[in-house]
Amino acid sequence: MDLYENQRSTSKIKRDASVNDRIPDGLFLACPYCGTQMYNKQLGDYRVCAKCGYGFRLQARERVALLTDNFEEMDADIEMTTPDFPGYAEKLARAKSQTDLGESVLTGVANIEGEQVALGVMDSYFMMGSLGSMTGEKITRLFEYATAHQLPVVLFTASGGARMQEGINSLMQMAKVSAAVAAHQEAGLLYLVVLTDPTTGGVTASFAMQGDVTLAEPHALVGFAGARVIESTIHEKLPKDFQRVETLLENGFVDKIVPRAELGQIIAKIVKLHHRTEI
Amino acid sequence: MAVNIGLNLFRHELTPAEVVKKSREDRFFAREIIDGIFTDFIEFHGDRQSGDDMSVIGGIAALNGKPVTIIAIDKGIDINDKLSKRNGSPEPWGYRKAQRLMQQANKFHRPIVTFINTPGAFPGKTAEAQGQGEAIAKSILESMKLTVPMIAIIYGEGGSGGALALATSDQVWMFQNATYSILSPEGFASILWKDSKRSDEAAGVMGLTPKDLLNKNVIEYIIPESRNHPRVFNLIRKRLDDEFTRLNELTPDELIAQRRARFRAF
Ligand SMILES: [Zn+2]
């Protein structure tokens, strides 16, 4: 398998393909976290709530444009036979055209503030960022590439969980990616996770929680089970910040919460401190 | 290929919905299975971090005289037992107990056998606070690194990540009337069709029966069931012994490579 195949070099992608750019500046929006109302243009380039710092959901290509100085996409067009589930092919086609992505994750080699990394960015606009076979395949290949080329992996997670239409194959992706993470880990390479809003279900129960270093964006929702499922199981109303990363930080599952605008710098710094030096 | 045992020859093949129903019945209990297959079982408790989850039974025993580590998810026998085990839904510290026992098995070169019967990991407030996702993620990751053979047997429900946490093994076997799926048919129907009452229909399209999963290479073997439980246990004992003997001939590197390749295929 030639990993260089299908690479597409894009330097500083413009954000014009994104849904957010189609939102007029004068549109009034409410912050999904704190409820503050503001004009779309007030969110700025990073699309962050001025009041609470919550980062509005980004599309993968938008994230890459904001974060990287250079990005070479890999595995852009790998095709797999999708299961013959009623309506699934149409749903996939719609997601592809809406996001300009082949699957719910965008992968490639990126330069972030001078550091070269294998970068994966999940896209919650692509079928809720659900974990399909292709999603798992692309992330697995990203780790395999990184292991072969001695690169750190930086992965931005965003997922509603399993891809129901793919059944058990979706579940198997959790194991498949984990095997690639294990090999990358054994090679002594850094795996840095950035938890973004929302990261749930099978992604939380696998590669989102397997990083050496775990960063998160402010107020991102991260959990395993859905809040409604929990509430109906324990017959109790859950507190407001339940499953927000501030709570995860308190409980010991996150290393650091980083405002979106500072992420590039912090990631580069951490990667740099993992360069192997002879002592 | 699944071989029908004589008993079933004159019965109609169960529909997926019927298999789902049967998989949830109390056909086999974890302790009965353990006592039926192994000798000298000694139960070990606790995860050494936060507690002891009763829904995960673990310990060491002898398989035809040879030491093995056993980890089993148990739904419980009577109502109080079932309540304390949340009908076989482990808490994070249940998975961490499993991890501890896996590491212990690795240290002492003991094969691991897991028995799985769970609707899924427990969706609770404390479970989330204690990192249910992290607990499952780590179980999966750590089992990818074990240098001892591991075989997982789903004997009832194999619900989602909560089951996978103990099934990232060299082989996965299923009892004839067990299921293994991404979520329950009820959940599937309510998410995709907004109607949990269509669960029988969901069961039909989910491909969750042992036969479906054998065809997809998700599992290696279907264990024929019988009302004669000792017969089932004798068969499992023999097969476990054979397969562990075979897997033990591999070097640790070969074993790990093979286990990872097994999942790489999906
Ligand atoms: Zn806000």
From Swiss-Prot, chain A:
Tell me, which GO biological process terms does this entry list? fatty acid biosynthetic process; malonyl-CoA biosynthetic process
Function comment: Component of the acetyl coenzyme A carboxylase (ACC) complex. Biotin carboxylase (BC) catalyzes the carboxylation of biotin on its carrier protein (BCCP) and then the CO(2) group is transferred by the transcarboxylase to acetyl-CoA to form malonyl-CoA.
Pathway field: Lipid metabolism; malonyl-CoA biosynthesis; malonyl-CoA from acetyl-CoA: step 1/1
Output this protein's name: Acetyl-coenzyme A carboxylase carboxyl transferase subunit beta
Cofactor stoichiometry and binding remark: Binds 1 zinc ion per subunit.
Database matches in PROSITE patterns: COA_CT_NTER
Under catalytic activity, the entry for this protein gives: N(6)-carboxybiotinyl-L-lysyl-[protein] + acetyl-CoA = N(6)-biotinyl-L-lysyl-[protein] + malonyl-CoA
Q: Into which family does the record put it?
A: Belongs to the AccD/PCCB family.
Sites where the protein binds Zn(2+): C31, C34, C49, C52
Q: Give the gene that encodes this protein.
A: accD
Which Pfam families did the record assign? Answer: Carboxyl_trans
Q: Which organism is it from?
A: Leuconostoc citreum (strain KM20)
Quote a single Gene Ontology cellular component term.
Answer: acetyl-CoA carboxylase complex
Query: What are the protein's UniProt keywords?
Result: ATP-binding, Cytoplasm, Fatty acid biosynthesis, Fatty acid metabolism, Lipid biosynthesis, Lipid metabolism, Metal-binding, Nucleotide-binding, Transferase, Zinc, Zinc-finger
Organism superkingdom: Bacteria
- Named cofactor requirement(s): Zn(2+)
GO function terms (MF aspect)? acetyl-CoA carboxylase activity; ATP binding; carboxyl- or carbamoyltransferase activity; zinc ion binding
- Which EC number(s) are documented for this chain? 2.1.3.15
Q: Where in the cell is it found?
A: Cytoplasm
ZnF start-end (C4-type): 31-52
Q: Which residues form the CoA carboxyltransferase N-terminal domain?
A: 27-279
Task: Share what the entry says about its subunit structure, partners included.
Answer: Acetyl-CoA carboxylase is a heterohexamer composed of biotin carboxyl carrier protein (AccB), biotin carboxylase (AccC) and two subunits each of ACCase subunit alpha (AccA) and ACCase subunit beta (AccD).
